[in-house]
């Protein structure tokens, strides 16, 4: 409340400083918010593409697996899967996007040669190889989708946080500061007018007293002149 602020020039200067600081902060946060939104839109486009690829790769992998099962049988497919010795390795790093730390997921040993798959040429068939290729491609797409969607969620959270801070400054803090400033300025003007009126009143009183003193002196002078005996 403005009434809680003492109307002093020191407080007025302090509020002016806070207003300038808050306005700079507001502008900076607006720029950050706009930049985050632009980055988010880029990531959103990428996420939509990755999601489309993910759905397509999943359908392809399922079709290849069904074909391998139909042509080679479940036993052969399960045997090829069980022969796998090396599993994919996942490592995560961090990257900074306009102050937002998002994960960067790196994978290795996802796509493999026949030897790396463990079953070799004799224990495989073209259908099983195609199914393995399709699922390795699907795994890489899943990893990319996880990275992109996690980044998107973090960016969206930061955008919402920044928007709340912008709104708090724009619709709460700055209006309160301007209200306090206006209140102090009005009170200081009132005090100044009261002081001017007080000084003017003192001045008028002093002038009136001086006039009274002059009149008294004049009357005394006239009386003295009247009482002085005339020369013979």
UniProtKB/Swiss-Prot annotation:
It comes from the Archaea. Its main location: membrane. Has multiple subunits with at least A(3), B(3), C, D, E, F, H, I and proteolipid K(x). It is a peripheral membrane protein. InterPro entries: V_ATPase_D. Keywords: ATP synthesis, Cell membrane, Hydrogen ion transport, Ion transport, Membrane, Transport. This is A-type ATP synthase subunit D. The keyword Membrane applies. GO terms for molecular function: ATP binding; proton-transporting ATP synthase activity, rotational mechanism; proton-transporting ATPase activity, rotational mechanism. Coiled coil: none annotated. Residues 200-232 are annotated as: Disordered. Gene3D superfamilies: 1.10.287.3240. One of its GO terms (biological process) is proton motive force-driven plasma membrane ATP synthesis. It is found in: Cell membrane. Component of the A-type ATP synthase that produces ATP from ADP in the presence of a proton gradient across the membrane. One of its GO terms (cellular component) is plasma membrane. Residues 209-222 have a biased composition (Acidic residues). Belongs to the V-ATPase D subunit family. The keyword Transmembrane helix does not apply.
């Amino acid at each position: 409340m403005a009434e809680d602020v003492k109307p002093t020039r020191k407080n007025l200067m302090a509020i002016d400083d806070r207003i300038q600081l808050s306005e700079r902060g507001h502008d900076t946060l607006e720029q950050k918010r706009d930049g985050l939104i632009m980055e988010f839109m880029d990531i959103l486009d990428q996420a939509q593409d990755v999601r489309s690829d993910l759905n397509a790769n999943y359908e392809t992998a399922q079709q290849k697996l069904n074909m391998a099962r139909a042509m080679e049988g479940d036993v052969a497919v399960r045997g090829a899967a069980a022969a796998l010795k090396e599993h994919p390795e996942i490592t995560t790093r961090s990257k900074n996007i306009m102050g937002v730390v998002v994960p960067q997921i790196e994978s290795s040993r996802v796509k493999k040669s026949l030897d790396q798959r463990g079953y070799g040429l004799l224990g495989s068939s073209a259908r099983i190889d195609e199914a393995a290729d399709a699922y390795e491609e699907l795994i890489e797409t899943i990893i990319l989708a996880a990275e992109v969607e996690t980044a998107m969620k973090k960016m969206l959270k930061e955008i919402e946080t920044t928007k709340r801070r912008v709104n708090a400054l724009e619709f709460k803090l700055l209006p309160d500061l301007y209200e306090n400033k206006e209140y102090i300025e009005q009170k200081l003007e009132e005090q100044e007018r009261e002081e001017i009126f007080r000084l003017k009143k003192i001045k008028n009183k002093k002038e009136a007293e001086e006039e009274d003193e002059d009149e008294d002196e004049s009357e005394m002078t006239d009386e003295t002149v009247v009482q002085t005996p005339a020369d013979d």
